[in-house]
């Protein structure tokens, strides 16, 4: 019996940014962690900034996504995002600096509500980048200090 793979497509406003096949896609949706395999029931979910793992046989592509929407059919996973980067292209020092800058804004008692919302968003994105980076290296990353 031949193995059946999901078609996986990650699209941004610029077009397709990742295309491949997978026997398993794992990600965090609005309802929690999901593992998606060929034949999965149809669903539509929002995605926070986070990590998407696309596994085919023994190889896993680790992707950082800025958040978006995932559409699942029994044979296809389509992820629509504003931004996506492969974990191997992420810069740990930049992500750590972004995280530190966001935390400084959040510590500022004079920060406006708008600044706090933007800092919270940047903090979540930096944490997701670090998680993608570290999971691609086989490490576990906790956002707690």
Swiss-Prot record:
Main localization of the protein described in the UniProt heading: membrane
GO function terms (MF aspect): ATP binding; proton-transporting ATP synthase activity, rotational mechanism
Keywords of the record: ATP synthesis, Cell inner membrane, Cell membrane, CF(1), Hydrogen ion transport, Ion transport, Membrane, Transport
Signal sequence coordinates: none
Topology term for the membrane: Peripheral membrane protein
Family annotation (Pfam families): ATP-synt_DE_N (PF02823)
Localization (cell): Cell inner membrane
Domain of life: Bacteria
GO cellular component: plasma membrane; proton-transporting ATP synthase complex
Functional summary from the UniProt entry: Produces ATP from ADP in the presence of a proton gradient across the membrane.
Membership in a protein family: Belongs to the ATPase epsilon chain family.
Assembly and binders: F-type ATPases have 2 components, CF(1) - the catalytic core - and CF(0) - the membrane proton channel. CF(1) has five subunits: alpha(3), beta(3), gamma(1), delta(1), epsilon(1). CF(0) has three main subunits: a, b and c.
PANTHER family linked: ATP SYNTHASE DELTA/EPSILON CHAIN (PTHR13822), ATP SYNTHASE EPSILON CHAIN, CHLOROPLASTIC (PTHR13822:SF10)
UniProt name for this protein: ATP synthase epsilon chain
Organism: Francisella tularensis subsp. tularensis (strain SCHU S4 / Schu 4)
Organism phylogeny: Bacteria, Pseudomonadati, Pseudomonadota, Gammaproteobacteria, Thiotrichales
């Amino acid at each position: 019996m031949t193995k059946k793979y999901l078609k996986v497509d990650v699209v941004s406003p610029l077009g397709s940014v990742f295309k491949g096949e997978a026997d398993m896609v794992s990600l965090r949706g609005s309802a929690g962690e999901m593992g998606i395999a060929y034949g999965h029931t149809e669903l539509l979910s929002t995605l926070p900034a986070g990590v998407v793992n696309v596994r085919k046989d023994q190889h896993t592509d680790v992707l950082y996504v800025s958040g978006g929407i995932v559409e699942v059919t029994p044979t296809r996973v389509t992820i629509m995002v504003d931004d996506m980067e492969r974990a191997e292209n992420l810069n740990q020092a930049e992500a750590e600096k972004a995280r530190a800058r966001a935390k400084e804004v959040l510590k500022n008692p004079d920060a406006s509500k708008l600044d706090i919302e933007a800092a919270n968003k940047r903090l979540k994105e930096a944490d997701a980048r670090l998680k993608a980076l570290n999971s691609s290296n086989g490490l576990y990353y906790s956002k707690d200090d």
